Amino acid sequence: MTVIGLLGSCINLESESYDSINTTIFPTNADDADALVIAAAYGPFRADGYSGLFQCAKGGLASNTDMSTDLLDCKWGDSWWPAVLQLNFTATSDIPTSFYGTWANHIGKMTLTLDRISGIDMKEEEKTRLIAETRCGRGWLAYILYDLYGPIQIPSLEVLQNPTQKVIVPRSSKEETVKLIEDDLKAAAEVLPAKYSKSDENFGRFTKGLAYTVLMKLYMHEKEWGKAVECGREVMKCGYSLVTNYKDIFTLDNEGNDEMIFSCIETRGVNEQMWHAHVLPSNYPTTNPNIQKWNGYRMPWQFYHSFDPKDKRLEVICSEYVGTDGVTYNETNPGEYLDKGALPIKYGEDPTQTSENSEVDVVVYRYADVLTLMAEALARSNNAVTQEAVDRLNDVHTRAGLAAYQLSDFTSLDDFLGAVLKERGHELWGEGCRRSDLIRYGLYIDYAIKYKGSTTAKEYMNLMPLPQSVITESSGQVIQNEGY
């Protein structure tokens, strides 16, 4: 089913809501076009409390997909979490179906936006950029949904322009879905600037670096290793670099750093995130005592112990602390706080935070993600471990204070790929990469059984179920994923 209308907010810009649009009076000029693109193309890609794809709460893409793997766990037992934590997906499960139910209709909103801005009398260069941003957003959202659910519904412009007619849009084929994603991202990459610096007026908007990063992830999903390498090389031309100290990536003072490919800009009263509120125990001592602490998210002890003790990335994970009650809590004396694992602190404190809401930017994609994907894609495309693949892995590995790998350290391709998977887990936990990585390696279900003790995980759960409401309302014309 398709739902027509525009709703959104984005980045650090004024947000507007367009539930219905009189196209004879809006949009008519460049400002209207910009507002429409901000609402439609950027609306999904935000982190604001309980809103947006990248929120830190129960509706967040990164937190929920990582929670279904060996990386994260949650102490809360309300109705939302068990299906994810135990990989017990059904067509009526809240979290597994929510991303499709919430965001699938935004594909159509972006298609309508492309049509509505095409005829506006404005500077051609600006119009071309806005079209590219909208196509980047559509391709990105389509990729996210495709990764989670497989082929998606793609309504035509004709259907979208006749919202009063009930038209059931079936799921597109795999080939049609991939083509939409690929075409949109390639078109965007041809137009958008490589990157923006924090001082740029358009900082926070989509870039060539983002378009190629998402396209690289699509090709990794499709096992098109050579094409993934090509995309990685394009990102490497965009001017990104690794931040020297891992912990500095995630701080208020270092927002907009050169490692960041895309982040959700958080600003007091506009968009605010709740990671620390979801992680910290009530008795955890913070420099700012006004941060709310709900004692939820954890890093399982088995994953914590997979780090080398010398790994500097452990600096943003807390395995022991002296509580405000004077008691020392750790793995052997967990109390009610560390029984499910260490504290995945990740982000720096917001010194002016007075509630659950922080204005530290939420990381979405960064250069370390691309470099480690490059290492994997290079090895897979050559069917052998190459020096270049080892070098890309070392770019990230040595930043963590660990000794560089040598080519001779790896006795086989599988040995190297295992090292890459481990590195990506240690580097990118909490950033939403693990589920896709494990599926690509054929380990997602195995890990759910081995590390989460799941008795319900099945191979078909590599894809999440579409909401049952979508199937019911379509009278069966929209086909559910196998197994559900």
What are these regions (language model features)?
Residues C10-S63, L112, E175, Q477-Y484:
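Acidic, glycine-rich segments characteristic of secretory precursors and extracytoplasmic regions
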Residues T24, S51-C74, I152-L157, P193-V214, ...:
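Short, surface-exposed recognition loops and adjoining beta-strand edges that mediate ligand/DNA contacts
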